[in-house]
Structure formats: C-alpha cells, structure tokens
C-alpha cells in the first residue's frame, strides 16, 4: 500500500516531524453534501484542524494514487465533478487501476490513513448495519465495511455516532464482537448523527482530549487488533428531534424500497431525502457536527502526540 501513497508537502513534513495529523474522508465532499456547501465545509474543516495545532490530511484517490492531503484544486474537483465515484475497500483496486477519481469512504480512508502512519481520523458518522426494508423480512443484512475495518485497523475514528438511517443496536453489537472500544466524548450515550442520544450507551466516557488520548495510547500498548471509536454528539443547538428524524427515515425507507435503491447508493439516497423533507435543516446539522468533530479530533490528535 505505501508505494501507492502520495502526500502534500504539508502532510509529509508533519509526518516526518512526528507532528499531529488528522485524516479526513472525501465521500462527504462528493456524495454527502451538495455544491457549494460541500466545498465550503471541506475548506472550513481543514482550517479548524489547523487552528488546534494539527495538520489536516483529506484522503482521496486521484490518477492511480492514494492522495494523503489534497490541494485546494483537488478539493474543488471532488466537490464539483460528476465523475467522482464512491470508493469502499472492494472498489479501491478498480479505481486505482483505471485511474478514476475516487472519494474514499470511512473504511477506505481509515485503511489509507493507517498505512500513512496517521493515528486519528475525523468523519461525520460511521456506516454500520442497515435497517431492513419494511415488509421484507427475508432481506439480507447490509453491513458496512466501516465496521470490519475498525475491527482490524489501529486508528481512532472521531464521529457523531453511526448515521441515523442505520440499525444502531445491531451496529453496536458488531462493534462489540469486533472488539472496538467505543468512547463517549462528554457523554454516556451513543449519539445518532442528527440526534444526541439513540437510547444506547457507550463503553466508557471521557471528558477531555487528554483522557481520550490516554485510553487510545493504552490500547496501542496492548497491541490488540482494531481501533477506538470516539463518539462526539452534535452540539445541542444543532441537534434534531429524534421522533421527527425517525418519522422521516421510515418514510424514506419505504420510498427507497419502492424505487429499488440498493448497495452503495443507499446512504446518499437517504441523506438527500432527509435534506429535502427537513427543508435543509438536516444538511445544516450535518455541517455543524462535522465541524465539531474536527475540533475534538484535532485536540485528541495533539494530546496523543503530547502524551507519548
């Protein structure tokens, strides 16, 4: 993997000097938000990371290379190009071989970041176990590769929980089976992306970046496979009402089943539907939580380097 990596000078220098670096995914740019909000948010998130003393490394696949850190022109390309494809692990060899423009999912970003020696990765929300479509009890479980990658990759992922469109209980069961440590940042509850509490708990609560870093460092010392998931609830002023979100998701799932949407198109479809039916409020919540995660993730990355 390492010989396929290309770095921006800023990221390469930071890694060489053992400075804190924060990985960022690119699917949120190409598939998670519309233009121009996607480009503006990507730029603002990178600046938030820098403001805390860390270096941002947005990851994507461009020209047959795994890019660790993007130029502003590359960010704009991902934000505007209809040719950008969503790259999970199974897609990575194809996208590399064809030299396509690829936006990396949580699973692929985590894999590339770990190969580059980056310890902390910030995203909006992780994938997980999808809910079954109404009226189809025989439907197979759709389980995101994000979970299996977290179970085998030494990386810390900071997010606002699992996306609300997922089966949260089943997702947490898989994380437990894989041995992933789930930390709640200033919370005892597992958040659900748009909402602050899904009704499920976390493995442990941490209230400072230093406390989170201590747990991460202890896990690294154990040499256990897999990583740490730090869940950081969306700020209260931007959180959505859980009952409203559930109602919209139920309606969206019915529409999705009627339209035959499957596979990697599911999450973008559901997020777009939520944006539409909430008159853009879901998008604003998404932007707010990503920025909040960038702030906390950068602080944890700095604390992790300082504590070693």
From Swiss-Prot:
Cited PANTHER family: CARBOHYDRATE KINASE PFKB DOMAIN-CONTAINING PROTEIN, ZGC:136858
UniProt-listed Enzyme Commission number(s): 4.2.1.70
Its biological purpose: Catalyzes the reversible cleavage of pseudouridine 5'-phosphate (PsiMP) to ribose 5-phosphate and uracil. Functions biologically in the cleavage direction, as part of a pseudouridine degradation pathway.
Active site, per annotation: 25, 163
Keywords, ordered alphabetically: Glycosidase, Hydrolase, Lyase, Manganese, Metal-binding
InterPro entries assigned to the protein according to its UniProt record, in alphabetical order: Indigdn_synthA-like, PsuG
Binding annotation for substrate: 86, 106, 144-146
GO biological process, any: nucleobase catabolic process
Cofactor(s) of this protein: Mn(2+)
SUPFAM superfamilies: Indigoidine synthase A-like (SSF110581)
Biological classification of the source: Bacteria, Bacillati, Bacillota, Clostridia, Eubacteriales
Cellular compartments per GO CC: cytoplasm
Gene3D superfamilies: Indigoidine synthase domain (3.40.1790.10)
Protein name, per record: Pseudouridine-5'-phosphate glycosidase
Residues involved in Mn(2+) binding: 142
């Amino acid at each position: 993997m390492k010989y396929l990596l290309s770095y921006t000078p800023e990221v390469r220098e930071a890694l060489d000097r053992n400075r804190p670096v924060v990985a960022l995914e690119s699917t949120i740019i190409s598939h998670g938000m519309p233009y121009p909000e996607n480009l503006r948010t990507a730029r603002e998130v990178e600046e938030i990371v820098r403001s805390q003393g860390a270096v941002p490394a947005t990851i994507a696949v461009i020209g047959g290379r795994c890019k660790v850190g993007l130029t502003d022109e590359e960010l704009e390309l991902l934000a505007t190009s209809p040719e950008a494809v969503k790259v999970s692990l199974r897609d990575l060899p194809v996208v590399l071989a064809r030299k396509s423009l690829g936006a990396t999912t949580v699973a692929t970003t985590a894999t590339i970041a770990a190969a580059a020696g980056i310890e902390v990765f910030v995203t909006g929300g992780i994938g997980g176990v999808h809910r079954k479509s109404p009226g189809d009890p025989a439907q197979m479980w759709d389980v995101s590769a994000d979970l299996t990658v977290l179970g085998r990759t030494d990386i810390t992922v900071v997010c606002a929980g699992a996306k609300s469109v997922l089966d949260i209980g089943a997702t947490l069961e898989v994380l437990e089976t894989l041995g992933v440590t789930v930390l709640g940042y200033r919370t005892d509850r597992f958040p659900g992306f748009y909402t602050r509490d899904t009704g499920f708990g976390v493995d442990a609560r941490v209230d400072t970046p230093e406390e989170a870093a201590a747990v991460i460092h202890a896990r690294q010392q154990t040499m256990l496979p897999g990583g740490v998931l730090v869940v950081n609830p969306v700020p209260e002023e931007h959180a959505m009402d859980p009952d409203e979100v559930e109602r919209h998701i139920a309606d969206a799932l019915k529409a999705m089943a009627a339209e035959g949407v499957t596979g990697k198109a599911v999450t973008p479809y559901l997020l777009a539907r939520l944006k539409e039916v909430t008159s853009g409020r879901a998008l604003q919540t998404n932007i707010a939580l990503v920025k909040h995660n960038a702030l906390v993730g950068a602080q944890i990355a700095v604390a992790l380097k300082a504590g070693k």
